[in-house]
Amino acid sequence: MGVLVKNLVEDLKLEVLNKGKDDIELNISDINRPGLQFSGFYNYFANERVQLIGKTEWSFLDVMSPELRKKRVAKFFQFETPCVIITRNLKPHKEVLENSRKYNRWLLNTSNISTRFTSKLMNYLDEKLAPETRLHGVLVDVYGIGILITGESGIGKSETALELIKRGHRLVADDAVDIKEIEGKLIGSSPYVTSGMLEVRGLGIIDVPSLYGLSSVLDIKTIGVIIHLEQWKKDQDYDRLGIDEINRDILNVPVRKITLPIRPGRNIAVIIEAAAANYRYNLNSNSSPVDTIGARMKEENLKNK
């Protein structure tokens, strides 16, 4: 689903110079600067994009003769475009305003300069148009790493998150995690209704920022690791060295997945802290603890020869 232009106007606080149809949508985040079109070039025209008229395009129109400007602008507006945005609060030329009305096109204005507004608009559209999904789990920030805790209901995900919050880490989402893929990264957040809330079985729903302060919650976080909790299975062969790297694909983005078996006496919160610290260490290191042990074993073997 695309972004309605009328919502774009509201969210980015744009001035409406001419109102188009309410059902016009933006479906891509790219932007077109129509300088070539104003010069008469239409061999390729990305008319499905937002059309941005900055100082350069405005000045180009300004130096044209009235007859030529009338012809070029009329040709431009004959193409279906979602909206035309003029930056720097530049006053639209009469021909631009008249043709936007004639063809019922959205004509908007912003006080921002072109480069700043382009960045703002593309970031906005990237977020709104990003592929998204909702997963069952808990998302927390541990040592700056986004940890998505998954597992069957009642396994202890929320209780583990509560222990992590008590230890100074931050909650992003509990129970339902909204995830968007933006530029190859998975950005997790909480649905509005449950934002800042944590459900603990037997205790009920607790308001995390009210109990632990505003610093105990985050609005969004990039997901770095998935920690999957499951009941301990005696015959299951669990990874003991950390060399079996398993990934889970979310929105076609691979994420490192670590399975932690639950059994009495295991402090899952502490283990998750270690997993986050180890993940951050591996991001900046060329060797793992297993490599270090292997090197030491070689040293011992050489000594014993």
From Swiss-Prot:
Reactions this protein catalyses: [HPr protein]-L-serine + ATP = [HPr protein]-O-phospho-L-serine + ADP + H(+); [HPr protein]-O-phospho-L-serine + phosphate + H(+) = [HPr protein]-L-serine + diphosphate
Record flagged with keyword Phosphoprotein: no
Active site: 136, 157, 175 (proton acceptor), 240
Enzyme Commission numbers on file: 2.7.11.-, 2.7.4.-
One biological process term in Gene Ontology: regulation of carbohydrate metabolic process
GO molecular function ontology, one term from the record: phosphorelay sensor kinase activity
InterPro entries to which the protein is assigned, alphabetical: HPr(Ser)_kin/Pase (IPR003755), Hpr_kin/Pase_C (IPR011104), Hpr_kin/Pase_Hpr_N (IPR011126), P-loop_NTPase (IPR027417), Ser_kin/Pase_Hpr-like_N_sf (IPR028979)
Keywords: ATP-binding, Carbohydrate metabolism, Kinase, Magnesium, Metal-binding, Multifunctional enzyme, Nucleotide-binding, Serine/threonine-protein kinase, Transferase
Record CDD domains: HprK_C
Cofactor(s) listed: Mg(2+)
Miscellaneous information on this protein: Both phosphorylation and phosphorolysis are carried out by the same active site and suggest a common mechanism for both reactions.
UniProt similarity note: Belongs to the HPrK/P family.
Domains: entry comment: The Walker A ATP-binding motif also binds Pi and PPi.
Name this polypeptide is given: HPr kinase/phosphorylase
Species the sequence originates in: Clostridium tetani (strain Massachusetts / E88)
Gene: hprK
